[in-house]
């Protein structure tokens, strides 16, 4: 781990067995500025699959990350994770933030079966993402934002396999609210580059 400088506040909570928080490789860093990281993983069964979070880089500025696996939050301002006692583990998240005023939050829990996967990459500007995936079967998510004033909220829930790959890729303000829920599988792919004055506003619900 190559952590350096400024007002980093790091709190890691891991309850039970088979929880891992890693840096992606030997070149990974957590570099500086007012980064605040709070990670929580809950996996009480020794036979459950391993929960894994890979932080990868995280360079600087006023970033804040709060991510949970096997436990949930009531809203994006909540700082106390509530455990899913039926969770079977196997959640995987990679987080890669490079700079500016980003904030992620979010969690994954599966209520008994079906490991979830979230790959999140946010590289710059005033982005915010409040992402959560819960309930059974594989939800999947691949989110890449890159830059500008995006605000994203994604919920994937209920007992079916959902999938979402969202790119956005910056240019002025962008709002996205995606909800995928149902007992039947949903799928969504969005690639957006918004140049509209005043920003973009998209809301998708599949149920």
Per-region residue spans from a language model:
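Low-complexity repeat regions of mature extracellularly deployed or surface/particle-associated proteins
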Residues: 1-207
